[in-house]
C-alpha cells in the first residue's frame, strides 16, 4: 500500500498527475493527497515524483 505523511504533504498535486491508475486524489479540505489503495498498483511513481518525499509505497 501507499501511505501519505500528512505532515510532509504540501498538497501540490504532483503525485495525482503522475499516478497511472488515478489512485490519488487531493483532499481539498485537508490540503493533502489521499491514496485509494484498492486502485493503487504499488508502482512507486508517486513516491518518486513527490518533491516532499511525503508518500511511501510498501509492497
UniProtKB/Swiss-Prot annotation:
Keyword Nucleotidyltransferase applies: no
Keywords noted in UniProt: 4Fe-4S, Electron transport, Iron, Iron-sulfur, Metal-binding, Repeat, Transport
Domain of life according to the entry: Archaea
Pfam assignment, any one: Fer4_7
InterPro entries: 4Fe4S_Fe-S-bd (IPR017896), 4Fe4S_Fe_S_CS (IPR017900), PSI_iron-sulfur_center (IPR050157)
Domain 4Fe-4S ferredoxin-type span(s) in chain numbering: 2-29, 31-59
SUPFAM superfamilies per UniProt: 4Fe-4S ferredoxins
Residues engaged in binding [4Fe-4S] cluster 1: 9, 12, 15, 50
Binding residues for [4Fe-4S] cluster 2: 19, 40, 43, 46
GO MF annotation list: 4 iron, 4 sulfur cluster binding; metal ion binding; oxidoreductase activity
UniProt cofactor(s): [4Fe-4S] cluster
Keyword GTP-binding: no
Cofactor note: Binds 2 [4Fe-4S] clusters.
Function: Ferredoxins are iron-sulfur proteins that transfer electrons in a wide variety of metabolic reactions.
Protein name per its UniProtKB record: Ferredoxin
Organism expressing this protein natively: Methanosarcina barkeri
